[in-house]
């Protein structure tokens, strides 16, 4: 059976840490920003981690 190809769209959006977790950017950052408080925008700058329920699927998409 051939190797699975990496989905380039997913590879651009997710990065793997050395410990094996998957990092992602926060949603709600680029649109309607003036309506958000400075605190909200500051917290959205920080990367989040992929939730355990999505982990297996995302890992398959970015498999190398």
Curated annotation (Swiss-Prot):
Any single Pfam family the record assigns to this protein: Ribosomal_L35p
Entry's Gene Ontology molecular function annotations: structural constituent of ribosome
Start-end of Basic residues biased regions: 1-26
TM segment ranges: none
Keywords, comma-separated and alphabetical: Ribonucleoprotein, Ribosomal protein
Gene Ontology biological process terms from the UniProt entry: translation
Residue span of region Disordered: 1-46
One cellular component (GO) term of this entry: cytosolic large ribosomal subunit
Gene3D superfamilies (UniProt xref): 4.10.410.60
Highest taxon above the source species: Bacteria
Family to which the UniProt record says this protein belongs: Belongs to the bacterial ribosomal protein bL35 family.
Name of protein: Large ribosomal subunit protein bL35
Organism of derivation: Mycoplasmoides gallisepticum (strain R(low / passage 15 / clone 2))
């Amino acid at each position: 059976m051939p190797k699975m190809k990496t989905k380039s769209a997913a590879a651009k959006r997710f990065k793997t840490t050395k410990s094996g977790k998957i990092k992602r950017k926060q949603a709600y950052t680029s649109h309607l920003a003036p309506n958000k408080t400075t605190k909200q925008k500051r917290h959205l700058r920080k990367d989040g981690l992929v939730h355990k329920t999505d982990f297996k699927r995302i890992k398959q998409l970015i498999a190398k």
